[in-house]
Amino acid sequence: MARTLPSQYDPFDAEPRWQRFWEEHRFFSPAADGPGKPFSLVLPPPNVTGSLHMGHALCFTLPDVVVRYRRMKGFKTLWLPGTDHASIAVHTVLEKQLRQEGKTRFDLGREAFLERAWAWKERSQDTIRGQLRRLGLSLDWTRESFTLDEKRNRAVVKVFVDLHRKGLIYRGKYLVNWCPASQTAVSDLEVDDKEEKGHLWQLRYPVADSDEFLVVATTRPETMLGDTGVAVHPEDPRYKHLIGREAELPILGRRIVIVGDEAVDREFGTGAVKVTPAHDPNDFEIGKRHGLPMINLLNPNGTYNENAGPYAGLDRFVVRKQVVARAAAEGWLVGIEDHVHNVPYSERGGVPIEPYLSDQWFLDVSGMATRVLEAFDSQNQPAFVPERWGKVYRDWLVRIRPWNISRQLWWGHRIPAWFVAGSEGEYVVAHDEAEAFAVARERYGPDVQLQRDQDVLDTWFSSSLWPFTTLGWPDQTEDLGVFYPNALMSTGFDIIFFWVARMAMMAGEFTGQIPFETVYINGLVRDEKGQKMSKTKGNGIDPIEMMDKYGTDALRYTLVREVTGAGQDVRFDYNRKTGESGAVDASKRFANKIWNASRFVLMNLDELTPAALGAADPGSLTLEDRWILGRLGQTARQIDELLGRYALGEAARSLYEFIWDDFCDWYVELAKPRLEALETRRGAQQVLAAVLDRTLRLLHPWMPHLSEEIWQLLHQPLEVASICVQPFPTGTDLPAEPPAEFALMQQIVRTIRNLRAFAQVPPLRTLPAVRLASRNAEERAAIDATRQAIAHLGRVEQLPLEEVADEHLKQVAVGVAGTVQVMLPLGGLVDVAALAGKLRRSLEKLDKESGVLAARLDNASYLANAPAELVTESRAKLAEQRAQAAILAEQLARLEN
């Protein structure tokens, strides 16, 4: 096979081909007893609810760069894939489908609903697998897990039973966040507060057996049907005499006690508050302190129950309207005020949360949190990158509360508890039904009847076991012994407590170790305006569309390059009108630049591999050889150091600069004349091949498919081998720094190019002469040594060099490179007068346009009425026009003088 590249790189052919190659040859599947120090991590399991979004693309590409780097550094690298069963999210999707069919899950029944859920999971999981492969992730698919599969279920049941036996899991009636849409409890972290314009209603409650009354203020008048008390501050002189007496509840006529409680703010509102213990967290605490009855008004679907009297069966918001209307009609509505307040919404269900008194399972994590805090404070385990997120982690652990682990759903790990029929809530916890009956018969007699708990565990319960259950726990597997604890956990800041802290607590409890050494926190991908992407805003960008348009490597490189620092957000450049991204297009052009340079090298290697060419003789290296090897060494050492401390974006930008500027624009161009001469051809070939090989290896973590495609052709013929397991260049065997004289040559060439642009001489036109002058003998010697390179790169025929510039030269454009004067004679090269006229006209046009724009921006009416974005754009445009005008004015002055 000829070792040449097609004229253009086709990512859509190369990417799936190399992904299959890597998996077929198990490059990502390390043997537990294989060589190398282990480096392991788990993929944050995406929910089986559809497709990946741009946030996933960033979150997964960043650790893949690290994984590929560590693999090339000789580590026994294992990256474990998997998916999350996502109880609430799957219920939301499937119940929406059922509503479109005019049904509910209760119409369908548990078994039929679960059949649908498993079918959905299979389809969604296949989609996600395909997308993860499409991203080029180096995951070990032979070790894939699912949070609800049989192995994980066995682990979850064991953990639940063990924690219950330790007294850490218990059952109780508590106020929970209830989502009427999903009909389940949700954690505090799954609640979003939204600021809304509402009302504050003032209601009059008569004091029993007197002419007095109390006025209470509320944002939820419908809950007055569940009031069991009115609270006042015990030292409030307005109400102190009423403490211990009763008030009459309108509508229902129930008598409720007036209590004194120091939690009441006597300065807020009227200083008297209605107490609804079953539907408000603060009232719940007041109710407990004073032994008030707790009356639940709510059905699971958000309608009111029989405790609401005439409003039973009505939706909560309908009840609100009817209660307010009745209060107004009967005269106990004192007033209504506009009121802006935060309303808690269910993150998944998208509806206002209801505080709801319910029997739930809880996990006391206080002891676990204490041990995890000790490890963090005394040993910095785990270490956070960036370090500031460690404070967030610590704050969550300090402020921890009992974890409500039960959910009133069907899809998930069913709670391994069985209730004793006919008892007052008696139950047994066991690994399976047979064990449950054995325990129950011993405890309650041979005729005992059991009913399995209908609830499932919070999805985060099984996810919190992910680092060790994916390696086989509770079995003591070889993988668990070798790859646990994980070296790295890469995830988003928004789930530091949801997931990271809980994994640490569970791992500490069941393995005695913190489950990961380092936690890398990535930022968000924001849209082109800097806004957070969300389904609600409709401003998401599909990573698959970007990969379809530009290729996977271009998207990967863009996402990582744009990370200015660990944990920083990425603003994604995107034109919604055209569906194009300038940033990803730039990365595609970068890939094409690499392809074209590699194609040139391969075309000039005479079918020889780097091994066949051999290493270049150090004594025969030219200045440009020594320079490119020095720059390669600098770059390799820098990238190795940056990747070692997770500065992934900075490393990507360093590599871009080396490849685009140093290798392609300078060295390849300088190698061209040497390749044409027989006596210099082999030396140029040797250095080109060696530099290309190492450059491809440096590139591999970011652009795995492109680098593999070129590397395979560079090294043909090969047995089964891959760039992904080649040594990562560290640069320790290369020069410490490039020769300084090369930098002077670069400055001179850049100055010649700038003068050419100023004189508007076409880039490909050869300049008859450029005059150089320097009083510095070392500079003149360096120029002499690089004169041929300067002439070649600057496209100059003659390069006279003088110690002192001729002051009598006319019509010369002058520039400076270091202390070297660079003079471009313009006579005969361009029409100086015409050039001056052209510059003058351009300057006049620019001054006119900027004047119009400046006047607009000085107009107060425009600034007050124009969209803020347009004003910002106009100011930026004016600044750009003024900068261009300054450059034109300087050029014109130089030309006229």
Curated annotation (Swiss-Prot):
Primary localization? cytoplasm
* An annotated GO cellular component: cytosol
Record's keyword terms, sorted: Aminoacyl-tRNA synthetase, ATP-binding, Coiled coil, Cytoplasm, Ligase, Nucleotide-binding, Protein biosynthesis
User: What does the comment on domains in this protein's record state?
Assistant: ValRS has two distinct active sites: one for aminoacylation and one for editing. The misactivated threonine is translocated from the active site to the editing site. The C-terminal coiled-coil domain is crucial for aminoacylation activity.
**What chemistry does it catalyse, as a reaction equation?**
tRNA(Val) + L-valine + ATP = L-valyl-tRNA(Val) + AMP + diphosphate
Q: Which GO terms describe its biological process?
A: valyl-tRNA aminoacylation
Query: What positions does the entry give for ATP binding?
Result: 535
How does the record describe its quaternary structure? Monomer.
Top-down, what is the taxonomic lineage of the species of origin? Answer: Bacteria, Bacillati, Cyanobacteriota, Cyanophyceae, Gloeobacterales
Role, per record: Catalyzes the attachment of valine to tRNA(Val). As ValRS can inadvertently accommodate and process structurally similar amino acids such as threonine, to avoid such errors, it has a 'posttransfer' editing activity that hydrolyzes mischarged Thr-tRNA(Val) in a tRNA-dependent manner.
- What protein name applies here? Valine--tRNA ligase
Q: What is its EC number?
A: 6.1.1.9
**Matches recorded under HAMAP family:** Val_tRNA_synth_type1
Q: Which NCBIfam families match?
A: PRK05729.1 (NF004349), valS (TIGR00422)
Where would I look for the motif 'HIGH' region in this sequence? 46-56
MF terms in GO: aminoacyl-tRNA deacylase activity; ATP binding; valine-tRNA ligase activity
Q: Where would you find this protein in the cell?
A: Cytoplasm
By sequence similarity, the record places it as follows:
Belongs to the class-I aminoacyl-tRNA synthetase family. ValS type 1 subfamily.
InterPro entries, per database record: aa-tRNA-synth_I_CS, aa-tRNA-synth_Ia, Anticodon_Ia_Val, M/V/L/I-tRNA-synth_anticd-bd, Rossmann-like_a/b/a_fold, tRNA-bd_arm, tRNAsynth_Ia_anticodon-bd, Val-tRNA_synth_C_sf
Q: Which Pfam families match?
A: Anticodon_1 (PF08264), tRNA-synt_1 (PF00133), Val_tRNA-synt_C (PF10458)
Q: Per the Swiss-Prot or TrEMBL record, what residue ranges does the short sequence motif 'KMSKS' region cover? A: 532-536
Q: Which residues form a coiled coil?
A: 839-897
